[in-house]
């Protein structure tokens, strides 16, 4: 059920940016209040990302009010903060469907709206893409403006600084808005800074500034002295020296919840030449006290009653795989003081909270820097430490060269705990863990393990930690079967699977937690069922022995079929001249859409019913 728009009279008049720009300026504060309340009421009914969007209401309104979107291009980074943008760009009445199957995409998505100029989901891409658009805009000569909005977390990533460096070098007209909601850069926010921002973005100041640069450019000693004096004086007021050094005109910080200051400053900056950076201070969760107090807890929320000012407590059911990993990490750290835990800004999601509290000196959150996380781990391993990198499958894609060049090439003992492998559900195609088996199994020296349940996950983490070479354990989002997890840890024999059920005719080789869904098919078909455990090294002897006693194979995995574990089985059989029919079940050759995990597994035929139906249809063909 959607939110009744009749309770929001000003928002009702701004279904699109064109309608928004027709509103008198004086009504914008009321509009912002209604937009924030509508967002809260909508997300609380649908679930989704809340705190970030609450903090960008005024900024979103100001950007669409000043810029002629969609002709002017507005590029959002990651997209957690873009819910107000979706509401104002013709999607207000569909917000209750966000992150649901066949509903609105959780992030800006090009196929969904002409206002979404860049499909996003991973961080730190906005500036690079916006620069490309700015270069194209200059060549077309139509006066098109380009704006990138990036958070203070995302801007710490290497590729964001690569783009800033390039933008400052090519001097194209573009605006980068730094949405600073963590007080990690500066706390100098208030009336004085808002006033300074208006002055510094105004025509008079800009003319004097640029004119002065041209005059001083002909006087090298004076130019250098003036530059140093400007840096010294400016550093006393604003923290923009770094951005100025990169070639940007820095303005701010200003209050990101002062709609009047935002609109006036953006109007001034819209006409400025060369790269501009506006530093905006916002409060994550703004306007909803529980979210302001706990922005991490309210970052992504389930359905809840906002009037109760509390989120529903998670049921005390089966532990998640992330929790299994977190407990293993603490247990292992107690046994081995060489253990070091590393995460690229995913402490809560990866289950590292307890470890970070118990072992703060051995815990490193390297921020959104996946490439650095892996090479940092390599350095630790060289220095006789035992690094464990906790990372989401989709984010490990960013560090593939570092996995190969910095870890595997030197066969360093780095353990990769790969969370969110397989289908993650509501976050959609940008976050599905569809490719890690494919890109890791091709890497020499790498051990790749796929636990079928929580206990295997714990034992495989221990096995990878002890194997003295690069190793990866991949496990899905959510909980497992509820099987008892053994406290005692044991090293599994590398490359050895186990037969779960003996049958005849068909051998089903399961990689990972889809073993549970394959059980019903194995029973119905009287097939042999194998928990393969290892993608690399694979249990070749077991597969070949099954080839001698079975007529056909079925492989099952929650990874892309192309290049996945099933492909490894195919290669093994062909290499040994075992020409057996093989049905490979897994993720198709497309970017898999959003929905609940259960919905998408069923859609792809990877639930119990679908697996059995696929095998039966294949056998009868």
From Swiss-Prot:
Binds 1 Mg(2+) ion per subunit. It comes from Aeromonas salmonicida (strain A449). Homodimer. Belongs to the transketolase family. DXPS subfamily. One of its GO terms (molecular function) is magnesium ion binding. The keyword Ion transport does not apply. This is 1-deoxy-D-xylulose-5-phosphate synthase. InterPro entries: Dxylulose-5-P_synthase (IPR005477), THDP-binding (IPR029061), Transketo_C/PFOR_II (IPR009014), Transketolase-like_Pyr-bd (IPR005475), Transketolase_BS (IPR020826), Transketolase_C (IPR033248).
